[in-house]
């Protein structure tokens, strides 16, 4: 399940223009981008693109917006190294190269008609936002939707205004937690690990699917809690984080035994990868 690549050649980036740049946290920015030719990116929730900057190289970044939002796509970028630091210097009107979209998306046909538990940790909310927006724009296609989000601290939360809107919406049941809080923070949510948000949930495993996006250290603990609630591995989707260089399964940097994260993933059903060495 993939969108259409920007160009006939998978290796040639297409020119795109930055529309706006928004600060999400002190270390993360949201880039709203459009193709120079005006066409849609053609992605699906869960896919990624390869972003290139002349003189700086290329990096894989998940798409943070839904394909239902026309005229642009968005990328959430954490400043973590040389390339992303260079991206953080860009402003509206600047151009960059985009290859993609690449990878296996969330299985929308299978998600339709199901109750969803969408679990994100840290900057994992950026790719999950693509799926949340899709559900928001097509509410009749899904059952109940629970959004669980955990961050290091209140200031590290992404999309604060959207989190508040989702929390206030009758369409979503939204629960948030942070690992730590100081006396200066104004935060009314829970304090603790994201795993504490799962036991209070009430759902039928036969009609529920969970999706998880976050730091690798989070996955095993979250999966264990979902299993305790009776949710089987074939009803848990995970988006795996790997260093994807080529994006088309040629370089092997993102391999997990016989699978390539850039092509067979990044979204997998848990039963497909839970027994593979190094997957989780």
Regions found by a protein language model. Give the residues of each.
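Ferredoxin-reductase
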Residues: 2-94, 152-153, 179-180
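FNR/FR-type flavoprotein reductase catalytic core
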Residues: 4, 82-245
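Local cysteine-cluster metal-coordination motifs and their immediate loop/turn environment
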Residues: 241-266
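Short Fe-S-cluster ligation motifs
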Residues: 257, 268, 272-280
């Amino acid at each position: 399940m993939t969108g259409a690549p920007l160009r006939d050649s998978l290796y040639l980036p297409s020119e795109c223009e930055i529309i706006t740049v928004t600060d999400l946290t002190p270390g993360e920015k949201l880039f709203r981008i459009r193709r120079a030719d005006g066409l849609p990116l053609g992605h699906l929730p869960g896919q990624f693109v390869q972003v290139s900057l002349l003189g700086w190289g290329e990096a894989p970044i998940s798409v943070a917006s839904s394909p239902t939002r026309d005229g642009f796509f968005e990328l959430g970028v954490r400043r973590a190294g040389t390339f992303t630091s260079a991206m953080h210097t860009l402003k509206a009107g600047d151009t960059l190269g985009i290859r993609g979209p690449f990878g296996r998306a969330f299985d929308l046909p299978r998600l339709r008609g199901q109750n969803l538990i969408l679990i994100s940790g840290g900057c994992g909310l950026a790719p999950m936002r693509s799926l949340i927006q899709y559900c928001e724009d097509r509410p009749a296609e899904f059952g109940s939707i629970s959004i669980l989000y955990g961050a290091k601290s209140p200031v590290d939360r992404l999309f604060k205004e959207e989190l508040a809107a989702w929390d206030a919406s009758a369409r979503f049941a939204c629960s948030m937690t942070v690992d730590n809080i100081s006396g200066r923070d104004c935060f009314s949510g829970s304090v603790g690990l994201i795993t504490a948000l799962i036991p209070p949930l009430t759902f039928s495993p036969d009609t529920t699917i969970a999706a998880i996006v976050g730091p690798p250290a989070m996955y095993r603990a979250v999966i264990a809690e979902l299993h305790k609630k009776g949710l089987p591995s074939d009803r848990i989707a995970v988006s795996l984080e790997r260093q994807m260089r080529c994006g088309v399964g040629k370089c092997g940097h993102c391999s997990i035994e016989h699978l390539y994260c850039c092509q067979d993933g990044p979204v997998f059903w848990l039963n497909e990868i839970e027994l593979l060495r190094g997957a989780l």
